[in-house]
């Protein structure tokens, strides 16, 4: 390990790699001092022009937007290694880097709008700014996942206008969105006739389990419905094993139609059972004189109400829940969408959201790029290092041709190389003699 005579701190291998970045970070500080800029603002800033600046930014970007680690913790680590960097410098530097990623994100959006199957979800996201017409700091992080792209948007609204604006560029005559039963998606489907909603069976299953947990008297009934829903998954899986995506539904093999018919029969039995149960609710509540007590009439009023509500919701959303039958490419649940929003949610536990609108926009862009890389099996560290190096070689601007950095344009050989763990050098062999600690400072 080397020794810094100015600070009296021993540098590790990592700090040696990032040593040159302190000069570029100083340039950002000098530039802000000259312009009087605010590190949290949105002013136009040029990225640092050091040949080694990308190394520290790779660490910052991956730590914050991919691993969900607090940036201050990383900066404390650098400080302990003799590389003090202020949080304001990092905030200003990230905003300076934002324009480099805009061409990539624009291309991701165009690619996604050429596809036909999507998974959508949303969650809260705090943006600590005050804007006219909005009370509080509660914003929302929206995710749209397609076969090729994972795209994010952070917006102050949770209305149908947000997915409506996103899908305004949709090119397909018909598209399927796998989602939960949130009303914004229902309104979107009413306004956009080329969008078909496929509702998530995992949420329906959760309805029954929640009812069983809330009312002990409904536990057995809820578990029975859990088993009914559970039988659909293996039937659909067996059907998909025989499915040929190149053929229409009627042109599929005999084995496909065998499982297809079994799936339809199971769904029909489920629908009939739910219909009978809902129809019998009035008889359970007020049985006629001399009439036999209907099954379930021993339940409390609140339990009967809960049971009816769950079954009524199942029937109300039945058409969306059975989209996967006629469109085998549509999954039965929205697990892919929910998995895609998990990484930002984990990071939210540490940073609580974004401190400015610009910061929120940058977060959405980097979430989209990094999660799309993961979708394609590409190591984000490989990609980010090469992309930022190309930006540095292009005069601190995005490359004129970004096709070599688009996952779907990368040939198989190069994609295999980019999917491997990032190579690291072993630190220099330690001296057999202990290194004295410099206490002169």
Task: Give names to the regions the model predicted.
Residues 1-27:
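Short, conserved DNA-binding cores of transcription-related domains
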Residues 22, 26-441:
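Catalytic center-proximal scaffold of phosphoryl-transfer enzymes
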